[in-house]
Amino acid sequence: MSELIIFGRELEPRPVTSTLPDWQQADPRWISQALRRAMDKPGGGWFVVDDRRKFGAQPRRYRIDDRDFVFWQGKNGLLAASDTCPHLGASLSAGAVRNGCLVCPWHGLELGERPMGNWAPLPVHDDGVLVWIRLDDCGEQPTERPIMAPRPATYLDATVRMEARCRPEDILANRLDPWHGAHFHPHTFGRLRVIERSDEDIIVRVAFLVLGRLGVEVDARFHCPEPRTIVMTIVGGDGVGSVVETHATPIDDTHCAVIESTLATSDRPQMKYVLPLARWIRPLIEKRAARLWVEDVAYAERRCALSVADAQR
């Protein structure tokens, strides 16, 4: 393999914390303990749904926690409720939106912000990048807003959504194992080593490949602000403050959605020229993220299958 060529801001030397090979550093006990700590954190009852750009004039249906919900644009913003019409059970997402109200496709019943029987709109939050829904019956203490990690003030964002045959915890476990990065994704990571690890987070020095063996090296911190999210934040090198948020939302007992948002920023003056090009740059970021997640979904699904098989023995 040809030599890695690094450009960008030079990072301060960090002492080698371990000379063990990656397979020994990737301690299953530490990963399991870190995952358990993350899953024990409060979630506020909030679940990420999708990229806010996906919600337009037509109603959209999403299955979350084994229930179908419909999202539509009301007069005062995005609304969400059960996709089942309270009249005779039609799928409301197959209907239309008129003057901020859902119109049932079977009988023309109009539903809006007011409850009807057991049917009622649920709390929705648009954070500027993602849409969240709050399920007050999921067993968590509700919070007014989602529990989120800090984001940069100015950024170029891109989001991908994929579905996987696994549990949210399998998605988090994948990200709590950064040691696999350069081995499983050699097309994206030129090299990677863990430089700091605690009970709550892990910091890696990683070289992202840009073109061939040309890469930019940064220090990145991984931590879980709530039980269905893990965030990577650039803490050293170019792009300090940039984040990659990976959210795992249960679809049902055997499937979950992976929603990953990249919020890229830079203090370099060239950033002001990059932001107006977002519509052309965004698909490139999404394509690279999707490629990674095709592989990482396979990792998570394999982990889930082995876990289920062990539990059945």
Roles of regions detected by a PLM:
Residues G45-V49, R67-F69, A90-S91, N118-P123, ...:
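Short small/polar-residue motifs
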Residues G43-W46, A57, K75, G128, ...:
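Sequence-level motif detector for i,i+2 pairs with an aromatic at +2
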Residues D40-P42, I64, G117, D126, ...:
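A generic structural signal for short, non-catalytic loop/turn and secondary-structure boundary residues
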Residues V48-M148:
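Rieske [2Fe-2S] iron-sulfur-binding domain
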Residues P42-D51, W106-H107, R175-D177, E226-V231:
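Short Pro/Gly-enriched beta-strand edge/turn motifs at strand-loop
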Residues S2-D65:
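Zn-dependent metallo-beta-lactamase
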Residues T17-P28, G117-D170:
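Short flanking/linker segments adjacent to small metal-binding domains or redox-active Cys/His motifs
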Residues R145-R313:
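C-terminal catalytic domain of Rieske-type non-heme iron oxygenases
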